[in-house]
């Protein structure tokens, strides 16, 4: 069944879980996006590299579940899994994509993939943002770009993981 069909089945009399959905490639490009959950998915560029939709590439074929906490405090339960996409020509390599699906944490009990997650453990929450340019987390070790709306000093005498990370 198509994900779009499952997420659109919102009968006002029998509302379902409002999911979000995204598909990304190994370069971080978002090729499909849909959100009823309220999570903001970037329209241009990639999403936060800490989203589990990206870490799914490190364990192909395995469903990974996580509790993600946005900078505004909203919590989401997210699952991600890689899939191979064939091009149909002989000798052509298949491309690897990652599919992310999630909902607000308040629906976690209705989402089968959360049964092994400890939703009360604050330490297991994965702090994420929308994207590096819009994220308030200045201490993020995976920051790839400076934030647009905050003053961000780059220390040329210090070397971190990237230009924007000085640890």
Each model region followed by its residue ranges:
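Short microdomains enriched in Cys/His and/or Lys/Arg
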Residues: 143-167
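Extended amphipathic alpha-helical segments with heptad-repeat/coiled-coil character used for oligomerization
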Residues: 11-39
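Short linear motifs in intrinsically disordered
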Residues: 9-13, 57-58
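Residue-level marker of positions within ordered structural domains that often coincide
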Residues: 9, 140, 145
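Low-complexity, glycine/alanine/valine/leucine- and proline-rich hydrophobic stretches
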Residues: 39-142
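Phenylalanine-focused residue identity feature
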Residues: 19-21, 34, 57, 111, ...
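Conserved small/polar residues in nucleotide/adenosyl-binding loops
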Residues: 1-5
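Generic ordered-secondary-structure signal
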Residues: 21, 76-77, 165-166
């Amino acid at each position: 069944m198509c994900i779009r069909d499952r997420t659109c089945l919102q009968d006002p009399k029998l509302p379902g879980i409002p999911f979000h959905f995204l598909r990304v490639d190994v370069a971080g490009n978002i090729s499909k996006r849909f959100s009823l959950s309220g999570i903001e998915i970037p329209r241009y560029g990639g999403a936060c590299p800490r989203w589990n939709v990206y870490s799914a590439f490190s364990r192909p074929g395995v469903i990974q579940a996580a509790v993600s906490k946005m900078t505004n405090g909203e919590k989401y339960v997210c699952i991600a899994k890689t899939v191979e996409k064939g091009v149909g020509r002989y000798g052509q390599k298949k491309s690897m994509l990652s599919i992310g699906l999630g909902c607000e944490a308040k629906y976690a009990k209705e989402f089968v993939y959360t049964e092994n997650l400890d939703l009360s453990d604050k330490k297991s929450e994965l702090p994420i943002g929308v994207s590096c340019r819009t994220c308030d987390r200045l201490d993020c070790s995976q920051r790839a770009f400076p934030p647009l709306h905050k003053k961000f000093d780059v220390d040329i005498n210090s070397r971190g993981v990237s230009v924007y990370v000085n640890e």
